[in-house]
Amino acid sequence: MHHVNKYFNQTMVIEALKMSFYKLNPKQLIKNPIMFVVEVGMLLTLILICFPDIFGTSYLSRGYLITIFIILLITILFANFSEAFAEGRGKAQADSLRQAQSNLTARLIEENGAYRIVNATELKAGQNIRVENGETIPADGVVINGLATVDESAITGESAPVIKESGGDFDGVIGGTLVTSDWLEIRVESEAGTSFLDKMIALVEGAERNKTPNEIALFTLLTTLTIIFLVVIVTLYPIASYLHLILPIAMLIALTVCLIPTTIGGLLSAIGIAGMDRVTQFNVLAKSGRAVEVCGDVDVMILDKTGTITYGNRIASEFLPVNQQMMEKLIVAAYMSSIYDDTPEGKSIVRLAKQMYINELPKDIDGTYKPFTAETRMSGIITNEISVFKGAPNSMINLVKQQQGNIPLNIESICMDVSSKGGTPLIVIENNVMLGVIYLKDVIKDGLVERFAELRKMGIETVMCTGDNALTAATIAKEAGVDRFVAECKPEDKIKVIKDEQAKGHIVAMTGDGTNDAPALAQANIGLAMNSGTISAKEAANLIDLDSNPTKLIEVVKIGKQLLMTRGALTTFSLANDVAKYFAILPALMMSTIPEMTSLNIMHLSSPKSAIISALIFNALIIVALIPIAMKGVKVKGYSIDRIFINNMLIYGLGGLIVPFLGIKLIDMIVQFFV
């Protein structure tokens, strides 16, 4: 469980209670038309308490009016509390993040190599600083020298320290994190007010949360229903007068509050805020509530193989020469092509070569290193004497053919054998001569088969995109349990895959971390960028994963589904409540004048006065009872969409009809002794 959970404490509850009273301000409450109607009713009741005969002869005691006033006030406070409590969790996390960057100093490295202590707010991009064991990193940056473990729990909530070193995928550091061993020299990448921590605080705290389109649509529906019920109540008054039925204004106010959808009206904002907070608990920052909501509509999920389906670091496990006489040359060539390769794969090749080669391998090679690119799909080194490259089979075969070299007869069968095992083959060439294959082993992450099966039940199709050949991709896809795969997929190809799916009417989600992923992240309906990724990727995405774990996309989509289902379930419950309360209260009010109504009074409430008070009390208590569901969401794990729909209709639809009858009757049995 992540660090946000510690904010479920007494202090936060007290703050939420204070905010509940602050939100009584009509300027605040008018944003929620349903609860605003309740407040207007409460104020009218207060006027009746002070001036009982202002709307005509009063038939109700002042004590009864005060009771109605108090219950209406409590109803509004409960609704305000649910929203304030949900908001408080985000603000508490922002306070924690703010503490991580307070009162920081930095050890600035001068041009002459000397150190000078400065305030962290004085740092400029491009300056170099040194951070030692036990010190807090004062600004975002890139490691240029040193190796150390860093505690990032203040940012990510993950207690295990991570290793940071220059080069590779683990050279980025975040201001506010703690160095727990050794030392690092860091080049500053951000200035005061523009750091990642500052952006996180702005995202989490947010001056004002904008309503999502679905929320606006639902609010419009609920407001329309409220207006309809108001019209019903207004027309009920002359009808009652015609039937010589006395319905005091206070009773009509109470009846209005009971019949309008106050339950979902009081919880709707809390549901949306809590949905964003549940995403935050998984260490994912949502740039808007809309992003989380769209996750609930996702039906196609595009996943990278490396880092998402398999562990990010493929490991060199074997050298496979075209013939045994080539083994030694293959090991040396593989080593030379990887000596300046800072990727995890390159480092694993160097380690394996050192383990297998008897003689001492050169530590430094004077030559020009050619790094891997998505276009060439190869890397290597060119010296005065030789050129050595390793790369994807298709790229290497094409290169040798272009230079009129020979293709060994067994090279393709070696590659196919590696691919059939789910591994990645890299062909090694020296001076345009193929020496053999490096077997990079992919390991599929635990538990993915079950999670993909769960997504399938929820109606979500999974598509694996990989640069591997079709045989390797098919093997991995079958083992992992994904629905489809796209082999030999370049970053730019992902946009085509996304557009093709969107053209079919699908809502698409994907993950990415590189600059070349940015266009696809922007094109996808939901883009989840890694915190360790480039700035352009994070700007293009609408979700950022602080743990840089691409598998999180699965959890975020499930949370989005849960958000929509929670909103739907509680709306169903609220509307069913209104129907039940309508048939529970009206017969009790009108049976004295219309005897035929007695047959509809199935609850046998003791009197019209106790019926109104009981319904009002139930109306207030049900909001409190449903706050935990609004905060945690309804359960969706392991069920198909149809099964979830049936379950929700039985629990929240049928339950919404039955619970008011039982609840109001039980309360009436107690209230009748006091009214």
Swiss-Prot record:
Annotated GO CC locations: plasma membrane
Enzyme Commission code(s) on record: 7.2.2.6
Compartments (UniProt record): Cell membrane
Keyword Transmembrane helix applies: yes
Coiled-coil parts of chain: none
Active site location: 304 (4-aspartylphosphate intermediate)
Keyword Transcription regulation: no
Reactions catalysed, as given in the entry: K(+)(out) + ATP + H2O = K(+)(in) + ADP + phosphate + H(+)
InterPro entries registered for this protein in UniProt: ATPase_P-typ_cyto_dom_N, ATPase_P-typ_P_site, ATPase_P-typ_TM_dom_sf, ATPase_P-typ_transduc_dom_A_sf, HAD-like_sf, HAD_sf, P-type_ATPase_bsu_IA, P_typ_ATPase
Chain sites annotated for binding ATP: 341, 345, 372-379, 390
Molecular functions (GO terms): ATP binding; ATP hydrolysis activity; magnesium ion binding; P-type potassium transmembrane transporter activity
Transmembrane segments: 34-54, 65-85, 216-236, 245-265, 569-591, 611-631, 644-664
Subunit details: The system is composed of three essential subunits: KdpA, KdpB and KdpC.
Family membership: Belongs to the cation transport ATPase (P-type) (TC 3.A.3) family. Type IA subfamily.
PANTHER family, per database record: POTASSIUM-TRANSPORTING ATPASE ATP-BINDING SUBUNIT (PTHR43743:SF1)
Protein name (Swiss-Prot/TrEMBL): Potassium-transporting ATPase ATP-binding subunit 2
Provenance organism: Staphylococcus aureus (strain MRSA252)
Origin organism lineage: Bacteria, Bacillati, Bacillota, Bacilli, Bacillales
Originating gene: kdpB2
